[in-house]
Amino acid sequence: MLATDSDPIVAIATAAGRGGIGVVRVSFGRGGEAAALPLIDALCGQKLAPRHASYVPFLDEHGAPLDRGIALYFPAPHSYTGEHVLELQGHGGPIVMQLLLQRCLDAGRGFGLRLAEPGEFTRRAFLNDKLDLAQAEAVADLIEASTEAAARSAGRSLDGAFSRQIHALVDDVITLRMLVEATLDFPEEEIDFLEAADARGKLAKIRAQLAHVLGDARQGALLREGLSVVLAGQPNVGKSSLLNALAGAELAIVTPIAGTTRDKVAQTIQVEGIPLHIIDTAGLRETEDEVERIGIARTWSEIERADVVLHLLDSRNGMTADDETIAARFPGGVPVVRVLNKTDLTGVAACVEHPAAEGDLTEVHLSAKRGDGIDMLRAELLRIAGWQAGAEGVYLARERHLIALRAAQEHLAQAADHAEQRAQSLDLFAEELRLAQEQLNAITGEFTSDDLLGVIFSRFCIGK
């Protein structure tokens, strides 16, 4: 906890720009009631009943109204931050909001009121045990949600669904640790611990439970982050037409002239609530045109960062020598789907062909021009992403959550190995359980550095 975490803070809590309502929020920190009551009197000219909406004038330093609106006073600990909080809801014009903000700062100068940093109100809520860290992150995720599914999942995380799963895992790990460490503390008790306490059975159940949580978290991360899909291939194979077909709109220029697309064209579409970030790129070929060469270099950069590459071919020509050269340069760790476009010119029915042998690629035959096979391609992208259609109860998760869950999974696997070696490895068994617990606690913030908190809350908007 930093020294500044107890400062009184103020910020405009609503989005920039004009609106029907604007909100200025004050959290009084260490100032408490001694700071709150004089500020309320200076701004509102009267006392406020706790947790009641009062329609009052917002007064300047001379007692003249700056605005009129709703004032709400929340004494600690019954507030968003867990501190004494004042919210002033006025008209949402930027000038009015700035005047009201400055009035708060001037009136609160005597007790050290300052502007809040990004995410500082939610940071206070975390530090005062109103939210755990996973719930605090869900606040930002709910604000930033780009799909209905992502918003609903963020709401479940904010409600504590993810945190409850983590706490249940931690409780089970702690229970098992207690059994192991009790045996280590009393070696004179000649009890076969592993058999009597069914330690291996308990560990197996914890590992299965963790695998389930990790699976749900992967689904949640997919809802939050989406999938980056790069369209790559030679010129004139229909990449821009495919982008337009996937998006359902004319986003990219389509002509028979090779090299029309010289820089990337990106569009995010939603498929079953999953954001697919589709990137149309310059056609891959040898060229003397400097502008086109720059576009091709950017294409390869996008391919290296992609989650999936769609390698487009002209179905009339199949896999040519130039296509083989392109395919040989694809990064080894990036999934590639071979898309044979223009089936309207060959008479081949739209279909998906999954690999018959290891090392082969999935092939999708389609016509971007007519739209044949586009739904099949969307379904294939979701399959590659690992999305389970109709998954209920998914909560939004972040990459740091996945990293912590995978690390905990690895520590539990090591613990299982030590359990198989029986009593001679009980101390190592206990240590791996401790490390797994540490990783799980980091998700909810029970074991977290100030540096990590700074990174997480700096990404919030000011006033939240």
From Swiss-Prot:
First-tier enzyme category under EC: hydrolase
PROSITE patterns linked to this entry: G_TRME (PS51709)
Please tell me where Mg(2+) binds in this chain: 240, 261
A molecular-function term among this protein's GO annotations? metal ion binding
Kindly report the protein's main subcellular placement as a broad class: cytoplasm
Provide the protein's localization: Cytoplasm
What region holds the TrmE-type G domain?
226-386
Q: Which terms are listed as keywords in the entry?
A: Cytoplasm, GTP-binding, Hydrolase, Magnesium, Metal-binding, Nucleotide-binding, Potassium, tRNA processing
A family per Pfam: MMR_HSR1
Q: What is its EC number?
A: 3.6.-.-
Co-factor remark: Binds 1 potassium ion per subunit.
- Cofactor(s) annotated in UniProt: K(+)
Name a GO CC annotation attached to this entry: cytosol
**Record CDD domains:** trmE, TrmE_N
Q: Which residues form the signal peptide?
A: none
Determine the domain of life of the protein's source: Bacteria
Q: Where does (6S)-5-formyl-5,6,7,8-tetrahydrofolate bind?
A: 25, 87, 130, 464
- Which one GO biological process term can you cite for this protein? tRNA methylation
**Protein task:** Exhibits a very high intrinsic GTPase hydrolysis rate. Involved in the addition of a carboxymethylaminomethyl (cmnm) group at the wobble position (U34) of certain tRNAs, forming tRNA-cmnm(5)s(2)U34.
Subunit structure, per the record? Homodimer. Heterotetramer of two MnmE and two MnmG subunits.
The UniProt similarity line reads: Belongs to the TRAFAC class TrmE-Era-EngA-EngB-Septin-like GTPase superfamily. TrmE GTPase family.
Instruction: From the Swiss-Prot or TrEMBL record, give the protein name.
Output: tRNA modification GTPase MnmE
Native source species: Burkholderia lata (strain ATCC 17760 / DSM 23089 / LMG 22485 / NCIMB 9086 / R18194 / 383)
